[in-house]
């Protein structure tokens, strides 16, 4: 797995869904290469034993994450770990000049105190005091934070729901085209969003032929969405967010409702707004009025597909967004951030074409 310095990537948490998708993307990457695989539970085992469906040259052994070893073999590290673990490893890597992309929520909040309030269970077992590091971490939404990501040492990749919700919403908050109150987000995602560790609600017998809301009030991603929405709007944003689990493996569809300040704006006007904002961002597609996104249209791709409609009876703006929760909603966005950090075009090594049907 030896590669030229400056292109070497460690993937920690390699056998989880986020790690697996990251490895799959980097195996086809022309410039970045996986040189270290880390994982506590899988340490000491050959890759082919763990993931025979994703062969890697030389069949490397998964290592117990060791900061010194990671720094020896990698220039970048993608951390695909449960919440509360990345914050223990990332500071050690940064001290050793390894640049980090964290796929967990550990550094998504600029305020450590807010993270502790939202992630209470994880926080009670930790003695975190990395206030400054939380402030320095860059929120990894490339379409809105590209220049900051390019020079960052620590990037906190957004959650899947925030990604799908913020991409259509932010342009209208930025330009002051919608009211800041009364925002509602209804989102639906597949079972892979729950990770690879077995959970009862994700069993086939539980999830099949059924749809259910969860985290109806106070879902962790609510405050994450509000944080960037407030920053872009220039004032505090409080919104309602409700996720739903649907019986499919991957895919996420978010519908955002807001009220237009100008009742004369049409769906065509609002579509023009989105197209103008994202015209130089190849990972974003804006559909014509009357065409609405489907999760199948983004499957296995790093695309986000957006659409707009307006109910002129009440000036209600309806924003729709589809992403693959494991790609643009997780690993693909992480690789997009890696590309920017490495001085590469953001889409390097990633397919923007879906597998249909």
From Swiss-Prot:
PROSITE patterns listed in its UniProt record: ARGC
Q: Which residues cross the membrane?
A: none
Metabolic or biological pathway, per its Swiss-Prot or TrEMBL entry: Amino-acid biosynthesis; L-arginine biosynthesis; N(2)-acetyl-L-ornithine from L-glutamate: step 3/4
Q: Which UniProt keywords apply?
A: Amino-acid biosynthesis, Arginine biosynthesis, Cytoplasm, NADP, Oxidoreductase
Which Pfam families did the record assign?
Semialdhyde_dh (PF01118), Semialdhyde_dhC_1 (PF22698)
**What are the EC numbers?**
1.2.1.38
SUPFAM superfamilies attached here?
A: Glyceraldehyde-3-phosphate dehydrogenase-like, C-terminal domain, NAD(P)-binding Rossmann-fold domains
Q: This protein's superkingdom?
A: Bacteria
Q: Does the keyword NADP apply?
A: yes
Primary subcellular site in the record, as a coarse category: cytoplasm
Name a single GO cellular component.
cytoplasm
GO molecular function annotations of the record: N-acetyl-gamma-glutamyl-phosphate reductase activity; NAD binding; NADP+ binding
Listed NCBIfam families: argC
Q: What does this protein do?
A: Catalyzes the NADPH-dependent reduction of N-acetyl-5-glutamyl phosphate to yield N-acetyl-L-glutamate 5-semialdehyde.
Name it.
N-acetyl-gamma-glutamyl-phosphate reductase
What organism does the UniProt record list as the source? Prochlorococcus marinus (strain MIT 9313)
Organism classification: Bacteria, Bacillati, Cyanobacteriota, Cyanophyceae, Synechococcales
- Gene of this entry: argC
């Amino acid at each position: 797995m030896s590669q030229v310095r400056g292109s070497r990537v460690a993937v920690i948490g390699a056998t989880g869904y986020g790690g697996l998708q990251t490895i799959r993307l980097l195996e086809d990457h022309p410039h970045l290469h996986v040189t270290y695989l880390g994982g506590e539970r899988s340490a000491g085992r050959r890759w082919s034993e763990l993931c025979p469906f994703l062969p890697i040259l030389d069949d490397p052994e998964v290592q117990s994450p060791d900061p010194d070893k990671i720094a020896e073999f990698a220039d970048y590290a993608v951390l695909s770990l449960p919440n509360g673990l990345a914050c223990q490893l990332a500071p050690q890597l940064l001290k050793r000049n390894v640049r980090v992309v964290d796929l967990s929520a550990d550094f998504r909040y600029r305020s450590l105190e807010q993270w502790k309030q939202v992630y209470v269970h994880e926080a009670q077992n930790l003695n975190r005091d990395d206030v400054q590091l939380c402030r320095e971490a860059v929120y990894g939404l490339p379409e809105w934070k590209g220049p900051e990501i390019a020079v960052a040492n620590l990037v906190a990749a957004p959650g899947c729901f925030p990604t799908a919700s913020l991409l259509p919403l932010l342009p209208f908050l930025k330009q002051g085209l919608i009211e800041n109150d009364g925002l509602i987000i209804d989102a639906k995602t597949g079972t892979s969003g729950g990770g690879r560790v077995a959970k009862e609600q994700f069993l086939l017998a539980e999830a099949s032929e059924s749809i259910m809301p969860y985290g109806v009030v106070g879902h962790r991603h609510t405050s994450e969405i509000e944080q960037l929405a407030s920053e872009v709007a220039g004032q505090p944003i409080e919104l309602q967010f409700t996720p739903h689990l649907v019986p499919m493996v991957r895919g996420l569809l978010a519908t955002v409702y807001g009220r237009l300040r100008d009742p004369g704006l049409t769906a065509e006007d609002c579509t023009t707004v989105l197209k103008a904002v994202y015209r130089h961002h190849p990972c974003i597609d804006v559909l014509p009025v009357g065409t609405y996104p489907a999760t199948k249209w983004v499957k296995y791709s790093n695309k986000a597909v957006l659409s707009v409609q307006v109910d002129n009876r009440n000036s209600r703006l309806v924003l729709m967004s589809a992403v693959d929760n494991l790609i643009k909603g997780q690993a693909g966005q992480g690789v997009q951030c890696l590309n920017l950090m490495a001085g590469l075009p953001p889409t390097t090594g990633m397919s923007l074409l879906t597998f249909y049907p």
